[in-house]
Curated annotation (Swiss-Prot):
Residues 54-176 form the Calponin-homology (CH) domain. Residues 887-923 have a biased composition (Basic and acidic residues). Residues 761-796 form a coiled coil. Gene3D superfamilies: Calponin-like domain, Kinesin motor domain. ATP binds at G517, Q518, T519, G520, S521, G522, K523, T524. GO terms for biological process: microtubule-based movement; microtubule-based process. Residues 208-242, 809-871, 887-926, 969-1040 are annotated as: Disordered. Residues 215-242, 840-851, 1018-1031 have a biased composition (Polar residues). SUPFAM superfamilies: Calponin-homology domain, CH-domain, P-loop containing nucleoside triphosphate hydrolases. It comes from Arabidopsis thaliana (Mouse-ear cress). One of its GO terms (molecular function) is microtubule motor activity. Belongs to the TRAFAC class myosin-kinesin ATPase superfamily. Kinesin family. KIN-14 subfamily. The keyword Nucleotide-binding applies. This is Kinesin-like protein KIN-14H. The gene is KIN14H.
Amino acid sequence: MATEQQDSQLCLATILEDFLKQRNIQVSVGVDSSSLKKADETFGGRDLPVDPSDLRRYEAARWVRNTLGVVGGRDLPADPSEEDFRIALRSGILLCNVLNRVKPGAVPKVVEAPNDPLVNQDGAALSAFQYFENLRNFLVFVEEMGIPTFEVSDFEKGGKSARIVECVLALKSYREWKQSGGSGTWRYILNSKPTTFGIAKQYKRKDSEVPVDAVTNSPSSTPSSEQPLLDQSDSNTKNDGTASSIDAIVRAVFSDMKQEDIPVIVEDMLKSVMVEYERRLATQNELLLMSAGNRDKLGSGDLGRTISGNEETLSDASYGEENVTEIVNNNMEASQDSNVEELENQDYELYAISKEKTEKQQLIIERQQTHTEELKHDLKAVKAGLSLLQMKYQQEFTSLGKHLHGLTYAATGYQRVLEENRKLYNQVQDLKGSIRVYCRVRPFLPGQKSVLTTVDHLEDSTLSIATPSKYGKEGQKTFTFNKVFGPSASQEAVFADTQPLIRSVLDGYNVCIFAYGQTGSGKTFTMMGPNELTDETLGVNYRALSDLFHLSSVRKETFSYNISVQMLEIYNEQVRDLLATNEIRNSTQDGINVPEATLVPVSTTSDVIHLMNIGQKNRAVSATAMNDRSSRSHSCLTVHVQGKDLTSGVTLRGSMHLVDLAGSERIDKSEVTGDRLKEAQHINKSLSALGDVIASLSQKNNHIPYRNSKLTQLLQDALGGQAKTLMFIHISPELEDLGETLSTLKFAERVATVDLGAARVNKDTSEVKELKEQIASLKLALARKESGADQTQLQRPLTPDKLLRKKSLGVSSSFSKSANSTRQVQTKHKPSQIDDVNSIEGQSDSASSLDLQGLVGSPSWKTPPRDGKEEDMEFIIPGSEWVDKHEDEITRSSKPENRAHTQLEKRTSSLKREATRGVDKNKCNSSVDKGLEVRKIPYEEEANESDETATSDCSETNLMWQLNVQVNMPRPASNGSSTKLKKNQSKISRVAAETRSMIPSLIPTPTRTLSLGAAISSPGQTSSRHNNSTVVVKKRQNPK
């Protein structure tokens, strides 16, 4: 019987549990007391959550703590109540920090809480600024992100904290979407169910209550202990473990329910219990009917026991119903009492807390007002100070602005004056003909160990070198040049200063630019560039020709230019053509120094690069200990420019010589042997000869040793005053090269002191050409007309006067061989004027030219005497190419035969007749210096000085090559042998041929216009040509 009653109570508990599950009311039925005690210890006696909103709040709180860390989220509990959650987040600090973790920089400045011990940590009143500023920044940014927001009033008591929780969870969802890759569009969907939480069973109990054992679903389970029900007055024998389980279930269900919901739940619960009991009774009745066939077999005892069992079951059911009703009533009374007491306690606590908060807030407000007054006072003081500082700063800025404006104006004026001074200085240099000297300091090469530099100071035109004691007085040596380029100067900057000089080639001037310095100092880099050429590293040669092409294309409407290029080198005192091997010649009419050398017309920069690459391949280059690409020869790139004015027909001729000298080197440093040693000796010898020429030019000596080296002969016209000359001086900054650096800089100082004279334009106008053609035509006609007289004069016998003329020509030829004899004669006699008829003789390609092969063997002719007082006789000696330009002028005061007769009478009257002729011959030989007159044809300068071409004072070979010498001799008094005259002519031809030089001039031969009056004013002064030169021997008889 007891077992059946126990089963009935167990069924009642099962019915209640199924009912609660249908209503989504979770209650633990199969949890033992130890599990309840463990849960109680885990939550520390706090109220366990029942509502899903609590779970979402816990989830939001824990995410905030995990995001900010233990320190950042220390003010927010892990499982906060609604009040704790609201108080922790009401300042907005945690929310702004979390937002900055999700979106860095969303809230630039978070207003932190004041570090004041008087502020309550459980949510005391904050400052109005902090309370509003943080929340406002958070809500503005969150609303832009599309996250659900809340109101500031939700943080007040009674506010809707659920919106705050939803906002935090939406922010959590956004961060998870962003961490997963952010694919697609993020959208937050409200979810009322908690995601994860560790508590599946939920209940609430008081701290004063003892845990109640639960009843398991297993029918074999028995109650472990018996506990009295709360407020239960009577004791019942059936109050066992099952009743306690039902009591625990009911109390657990009704503990957190509202008072108005309890009757409804109780009514539904009772209905469920009655329905279940009715179902079970019907089942039992069916079982009884099905066993009706067996009733006969049953005994009366058994039937009675069955009836009594049913009655007991019904009684148990009625007892359970009464028990539930009683439990519900007791619970309702207990809950009402406890609620009233709890409400009273809460009211008292709230009143105390409110009072305490009010006092603290009042204190805080008072302190804030005090601080506000202090801040206002400080703000006024700061504003006054700022106004004063602003006024002072304004005054200072105005003063500085005026001063800066003045400095700017002065700097602008200084730059303008500096530019004008530079232009004027360049003009003065052009007028003086001084050699411009630019200095360039080579940078340290990559990989060099030495970092000590000898360059102490460097400015625009000044260079200071630090010198140790072994080079003289320890200190600095300062050098001044036209321009100084530092190690960081680019190729473009170097070319920019030489560009005006290079462009003057198109205007008809001759220009020479050469690089000087020791080996490895960067000469080839400046002139040509490195092996691998780029737009930034192109040398002066490439840039100069590119600029000439560009300028010629700009002027193509007014001028027509023809540009051609030659490349030469001097290797071991031998002149070679880098584009083709030919013999070097002297200057010719068109300015081309090697007539048979390769002269290539160019029109584009690519043509120039191609030719220069060919020349560089042919140039002698070798590696030494000081330089991997040491130039073993002097190279010269010559650019010939011939322009024609399309309007006036004026022809301009200019040439530019870009010379890359081989570097001077010390044998012990370069470590050269064999052929390299021989090359170094020739290089140093030629550079030494260049130094001697510069020294002579700076000292203005009469004799300049150009012929000591092929290099000086090559640069003769550039250094002789016919060209605008510029020298690049290159030095190395290494300390071990200090000796070579000082020597190079001193040489450059001597070069800067040389004055060559102003260069002139090489211009030929159409009028000058016409006059030259007329003069040549008239001279040709005159020569043909008087050719018969010349033939008669050559057939006359040799006389003592002709012997005297032969002796005189021998003396003249000696002058062209020795420069010392020339200087001695110049000190005794006056130099005669020179007329260069090269422009007339240069018309060899026209019909009116004097360069005719038919005049080679034509004899000289006889000219009539002037006024019956002077008899002239010309004798043409062909075969000489030039004679020395320094000849002596000797005049006679009487006729030779009369003077000879007078001298014979004075010396002796007792000489025998057979000795008279020998004495006369000796007298004639001793009177050569008095009886010989070398007269050079004077020229008549043109009216327009700009149309004549300048002649170099130092280019004596060019002038001598164009010179006609006329020697005046007395008319022969007796007949002589014509064979002696022919022998004398051949001797003079050999002497003249010995004086001819094979070294060219870099500058085109200047032309001077021979006036018509000067050419034909004297009928007896005619000449003929042979091999580009003519020696005219003339006898002049002065009146007594």
